[in-house]
Amino acid sequence: MSFDGFFLHHMTEELRRELLGGRIQKINQPFEQELVLQIRSNRQSHKLLLSAHSVFGRVQLTDTTFENPAVPNTFIMVMRKYLQGAVIEAIQQVENDRILEISVSNKNEIGDSVAVTLVIEIMGKHSNIILLDKSSGKIIEAIKHVGFSQNSYRTILPGSTYVAPPQTGSLNPFTVGDEKLFEILHTEDLEPKRLQQIFQGLGRDTATELSGCLTADKLKTFRAFFASPTHPSLTEKSFSALLFSDSKTQLSTLSELLDTFYKDKAERDRVNQQASELIRRVENELEKNRKKLVKQEEELLATENAEEFRQKGELLTTFLHQVPNDQDQVELDNYYTGEKIIISLDKALTPNQNAQRYFKRYQKLKEAVKHLTS
């Protein structure tokens, strides 16, 4: 099972049992797309993991130990401002979608009550963790900012009004009426893919298991499936909130199940991400150095004119009395080659200043050679 709406339904019940009325004591962000809230509830400390990871997105209690960054970023500082010390008032799933809302109350700097909602959207690469002002519906902060150019349907930026993800029109399998459900079960194709289209929040594994159950009394079987008590279990390739036909190992809670299932997978993914980031940085540095080398080679080539500038300065100094004041060039005897040489002049400068100009060019290129070859 993926972390679908069906699984989140059962997880929401688990979180309510453990966290309602609890107080948020600490907020940390151990990884870029993950938030960990330390909550004191029922005389126990719990760690609530909220993940907006594109592959491993989920919400769960965890016993995993995380290392936190030494310097908090803007996102985590805003989260701490609004959530530290807050009391959890409500935890609810939106329909049977992969969206969880955690409503909390807190006090601001002057003692006034502040109500905010933490929205966790588990939607693959579009997963997000968003903090809302409850009264206005405005976004305070989000772990992923989404501008209009990225999504024309809704922007996820501080100050924007929160707009929920678009609805597909599918039915909530937990609340659909008997009459409508009976009609669907006796007129529709009940293959897994079709069940996913009709009913909200069914992953492929859940839909496959449900399809296999719908045999004789379909209405009764359907209701029993969605009323089944939670039985966290590992399957051949994944995990489930119920005992599925391919279940292998049972665990005591859904959170323990996810800790067991994701521990090695998430760690490997983080290592791969860090390796990819390191490779990207090395490649960027190599590209910068290649460009720098090309530029230095061009500059080094230009320094080959240094000796020519020195000789022109020497010739102008030697034959200073032959250099006119108002001309843009002068022809002199070049005692270095035994031939005539034409030297360009700046008419705005005196003969001596023109000579010094060539010496300055020579010195500049000479220093450049030292720098490039050091």
Regions found by a protein language model. Name each.
Residues M1-S374:
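Extended, highly charged segments
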